Amino acid sequence: MNSPLAPVGVFDSGVGGLTVARAIIDQLPDEDIVYVGDTGNGPYGPLTIPEIRAHALAIGDDLVGRGVKALVIACNSASSACLRDARERYQVPVVEVILPAVRRAVAATRNGRIGVIGTRATITSHAYQDAFAAARDTEITAVACPRFVDFVELGVTSGRQVLGLAQGYLEPLQRAEVDTLVLGCTHYPLLSGLIQLAMGENVTLVSSAEETAKEVVRVLTEIDLLRPHDAPPATRIFEATGDPEAFTKLAARFLGPVLGGVQPVHPSRIH
């Protein structure tokens, strides 16, 4: 039986999942968080589905083995690659980033034309397209935007170069006259201002990070595992499988003062 005092485990291929962690902290400030950024193997977008699945399940095994009460796959590529395996493998609730965003997009659209942008792995997996299949009267246009992650990981979230890239990527969505756009990668909220500028103010942007945090609230409430308000102050642990110093510098853009030190993960612990 899981304890309400146990932490919530969150992982991503790098720093993008910190947008999810930030949203969870905002909505559930009393919860302990353990976050693992797999910067030693990520970004996952260019990898094959079997490679992504292997890396993601190794981190999931580590977090579940450490006693988390819920596991959040804060990565669209990993969600599309290993969600079914994770839910069969673990005895704790597994929350992913795709379905929460799909539900919000269906509720938000006015003309039924919805766009999805993500990594090449996410778009070619058809995870979003399949998730939208149950929604009536929707027309989905999905576009891979692989270089967005590179810019975010470099800390470049504005400027002429990335705006030009965005305009090129998003042109098919404008032609399709989408009125709602799912940011199908947890890195992309850091580009939301630029994406909104390229798409126009009448297009609603749906952040998978915000919707996933709402799903974590719903799941923990449903199974009565919310951390009590009178519990000791929340602790947040951030770990990286790659260079912790580089992770810390970039992660500060996502979390600001909430971010403490980042601990390295020894390769022998996750394999």
Swiss-Prot record:
| InterPro entries linked to this entry | Asp/Glu/hydantoin_racemase, Asp/Glu_race, Asp/Glu_racemase_AS_1, Asp/Glu_racemase_AS_2, Glu_race
Q: Name the residues that bind substrate.
A: D12, S13, Y44, G45, N76, S77, T186, H187
Q: Which family does it belong to?
A: Belongs to the aspartate/glutamate racemases family.
Q: What EC number(s) would the UniProt record show? A: 5.1.1.3
The species this protein was found in: Mycobacterium bovis (strain BCG / Pasteur 1173P2)
Q: What class of enzyme is it?
A: isomerase
Q: Which UniProt keywords apply?
A: Cell shape, Cell wall biogenesis/degradation, Isomerase, Peptidoglycan synthesis
Q: Which HAMAP family match?
A: Glu_racemase
Superkingdom of the source species: Bacteria
Function (record text): Provides the (R)-glutamate required for cell wall biosynthesis.
- Gene3D superfamilies per record: 3.40.50.1860
Active-site positions on this chain: C75 (proton donor/acceptor), C185 (proton donor/acceptor)
Q: Which reaction does it catalyse?
A: L-glutamate = D-glutamate
* UniProt pathway annotation: Cell wall biogenesis; peptidoglycan biosynthesis
Species lineage? Bacteria, Bacillati, Actinomycetota, Actinomycetes, Mycobacteriales
A single GO molecular function, which one?
glutamate racemase activity
* Protein name per UniProt: Glutamate racemase
One GO BP = regulation of cell shape
